[in-house]
C-alpha cells in the first residue's frame, strides 16, 4: 500500500490548489495532506477512488436543482470560517448517533485543536435560528475540497447531506 504524507505549517491558497491538483487530500487528524491508492480496513486493502469535479463544467440534474431550491426556500444558509463550538458539536453528536462509521466522539477529536493549517469554511443550514446541518470545506485560490458534512437526523427526509455535497 503506497501512501505519501506532506507536513507543512499551512496548506492555503495556491499551495492547497497544487496538492489537490496532484491528487492529495486532507488528513483530518494530523493537519497534513496525503495521497494513496489503497486503504486498509480490517486487514483488507481496498482501492481508493478520488473524486474531483471541474465545477464550472458541472451540469446539475433537475432533481438536484429541485433539492437546492427546496432547501433554500425552507431554511437559511450561511457561510463563515469554520470554528468548533458547542453548537456545531451538538449537530455532530446527533449525526454520529446514526452514522455508525464515525469512530471519533467529537469534532475536536477529528480536527484537533488547531484549525489554522487550512483555510476552512463552513456552510451552515438553519431552521429558524437552530443549526440543523453543516458542511466544512477547504478553500484554495482556484479550488475547494469538501472535508466533512453532518446534519440533525430528524431532518433526514430533507436530504440536507445531499444538499451539502451538491
Describe the residue ranges of each PLM region.
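Acyl-donor-binding surface of acyltransferase catalytic domains
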Residues: 2-76
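Conserved acetyl-CoA-binding loop-helix of GNAT-fold acetyltransferases
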Residues: 157-166
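Generic detection of long, well-ordered alpha-helical segments
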Residues: 5-10, 81-89, 162
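Short alpha-helical interface elements
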Residues: 40-44, 116-117, 162
Amino acid at each position: 500500500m503506497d501512501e505519501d504524507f506532506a507536513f507543512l505549517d499551512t496548506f492555503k491558497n495556491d499551495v492547497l490548489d497544487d496538492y489537490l491538483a496532484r491528487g492529495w487530500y486532507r488528513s483530518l487528524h494530523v493537519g497534513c495532506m496525503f495521497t494513496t491508492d489503497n486503504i486498509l480496513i480490517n486487514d483488507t486493502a481496498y482501492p481508493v477512488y478520488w473524486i474531483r469535479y471541474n465545477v464550472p463544467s458541472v451540469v446539475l440534474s433537475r432533481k438536484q436543482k429541485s433539492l437546492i431550491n427546496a432547501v433554500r426556500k425552507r431554511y437559511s444558509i450561511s457561510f463563515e470560517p469554520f470554528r468548533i463550538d458547542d453548537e456545531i458539536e451538538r449537530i455532530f453528536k446527533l449525526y454520529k448517533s446514526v452514522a455508525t462509521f464515525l469512530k471519533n466522539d467529537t469534532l475536536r477529536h477529528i480536527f484537533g485543536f488547531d484549525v489554522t493549517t487550512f483555510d476552512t469554511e463552513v456552510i451552515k443550514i438553519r431552521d429558524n435560528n437552530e443549526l440543523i446541518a453543516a458542511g466544512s470545506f477547504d478553500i484554495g485560490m482556484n479550488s475547494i475540497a469538501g472535508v466533512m458534512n453532518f446534519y440533525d437526523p430528524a431532518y433526514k427526509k430533507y436530504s440536507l447531506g445531499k444538499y451539502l455535497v451538491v
